Amino acid sequence: MLWKLEDWQYPCYNINNGRCKALLKWNNSKNIIYEETTNNIIPILSLKRPHSRAFHLSIILIILIFITQFHLISFNYIKSSYYNELKNDIIRTELRYTTIYLYIGSTISRAIFGYIADRIGIRISYCILIFLSVLFGISNIIFDNPILKILNGIISGGFVLSELWVITMFDTNILGVTTGILGGVGNFGIGIIYIINYTLISSIDEKLLIYYIYWPYILLLLTIYPIYYLSDDCPYGNYIELKKLYNENENIENIENIENIENIDNTIYSNNNTNYSLDNNINIENIVVDISFSKSKCFNVFKNIKLLAICLTYLYSFGIELTIYSNLPILLKIEDSISLNKKILLVFAFSAINLLGRPIGGYISDKNYELFKIIGKIKIILIFLSSTTLCGTILNNFMQSLNSSDEKYSQLLLLIILWSFSNNLLQGTIIGVIPHMDSSNMGVVLGSIASFGSIGGILGNIIFMYYDDYTSLKIINIFGVITFMINTFILL
């Protein structure tokens, strides 16, 4: 559908692009629930407008994406360990290789679907992604080969689409907290699926597991209906309808003079009060930013050296996140002594750190943007990048002092938690920088950055395959220092 522009009332929305300016509370409003002059309910509690629908759908989808993405890995690992189907060394090796296959598919998918979303819109891209993910996921269950394990990673493109959706719907002043909440909830899905799979595998008859294994794909498939029929690509409506409208009027310089466009109204009324109408003549030409695509502009994105700096930062940061999940018992020096249920609880606990760290990092980034504009966001990235590297260095030095697997376990766990929390603060600041780099190719930019994050997970796991934990962590910390220097030189 095409939304009437009378819905984008100041001060709740950016009058130039229809993007929402708040999520949890309207700015400069005394009321927590609604804005006094327009009576607009805060987006987090509303489903009326496309912004709120996109946010709530993105929350549901991103957690389902991560649950489904890590479902087969966690299912096979827990089942093999619980029933002692294989030796521990074989289980660990198989888990590591399966994880790397998944991240390879994730790297490709994130870049491709960022590009596709810029061309055909988020809704249709998401529907295609879900269909392919279900197809490859079920095929992987039935046939189980390396190619299908890689293709199973295609579902990771949903991270890009969900983040891109809220970036398209919400204004730059709150992108840190909105994308931070989204990323935090999504990564928490990893812990959730490990808990669910362990609980059910340890509770139900082994013969029934063959039916249980399909449930995430069925649930994911059901989301196609609300995505396609109950949501919009951008604040103005659906990509295809807007593209058609734009093409019909491409040669008209002032689109406000068109008299026969039924669903567009440039004048905003609030309770029959026209006090805001002069302040809210929306520049409809800005719709072009949401629906235009150019191959030449797309490839020009990669000439931006600042994009490389952010890509390396996300490679380092999200690479740490994925590496911790895969190697936590090794880092804690308890790989051979810890029980399966405690391993699952550790994964759950570390995934839960995302719920706190990412939104806080995003909120701090937004506040600095409010005070210092884009330079404020960049400085916060550098601060959290340096703190994460420092935490990693302290952890590295502490690990060197350990003499046995059970010595100083609590201190080691605390240091890893601090390292992970600082890293989550960093991740909460990164995505909010993307619209400042190229607002007309956000899918390509976000897809590129997110792909580097998956590459970080691949490299981190390869490093832990060939080096001991101390040396592996040292390599990661050195890369963190190099990344900090590159960011300081390029971004400031």
Language model features with spans:
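Helix-loop-helix hairpin linking two adjacent transmembrane segments in secondary transporters
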Residues: 182-238
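Residue-level signature of mid-helix packing/kink "hotspots" within the transmembrane helices
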Residues: 73, 102-111, 157, 191, ...
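Extracytoplasmic gate region of multi-pass secondary transporters
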Residues: 75-77, 304-362, 427, 431
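C-terminal transmembrane helical hairpin of 12-TM major facilitator-type secondary transporters
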Residues: 375-429
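Conserved MFS/SLC helix-loop-helix module at the cytosolic interface between two early adjacent transmembrane helices
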Residues: 108-143
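Extracytoplasmic
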Residues: 56-84, 88, 193-194, 322-329
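Cytosolic juxtamembrane N-terminal segment immediately preceding the first transmembrane helix
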Residues: 2-78, 299
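Cytoplasmic helix-loop-helix junction between adjacent transmembrane helices
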Residues: 149-185
